[in-house]
Amino acid sequence: MGTGEKTLKSFQLHRKQSVKVKDVPKGCLAIKVGSQGEEQQRFIVPVLYFNHPLFMQLLKEAEDEYGFDQKGTITIPCHVEEFRYVQALIDGERSVYNGNNHHHRHGGRDQYHHLVGCFRA
């Protein structure tokens, strides 16, 4: 079991089901995104995101901010525009990977070290 799976299971064990199941497609999860003082927005993300290094960093920041006892929907404490940027990076990698261009994926987790601090307000 990878780190992302452990994090996801921990969040699931400590949160209530506040989102209607029919509202979220199979294989996806609803989250809230927004930093302090910013209106939070709801996003539906594929569960595959939870194994991506960038998304794991966002989950780590959520853990640091709220702990594992946050109630309801998982909340990611970053600016919505920064989350959209991360989402575009993840989706771009997934489209390259799904397009059988496996040789274009380089670096693993280390390729994101320059982005680690960009999520903090």
From Swiss-Prot:
Expressed in roots, leaves and stems. Disruption phenotype: No visible phenotype under normal growth conditions. InterPro entries: SAUR_fam. GO terms for biological process: auxin-activated signaling pathway; regulation of seedling development. One of its GO terms (cellular component) is plasma membrane. It is found in: Nucleus; Cytoplasm. Keywords: Auxin signaling pathway, Cytoplasm, Developmental protein, Growth regulation, Nucleus. Pfam families: Auxin_inducible (PF02519). Its main location: nucleus. The keyword Nucleus applies. Seedlings over-expressing SAUR32 display reduced hypocotyl elongation and are defective in apical hook maintenance when grown in the dark. May play a role in the apical hook development. Belongs to the ARG7 family. This is Auxin-responsive protein SAUR32. It comes from Arabidopsis thaliana.
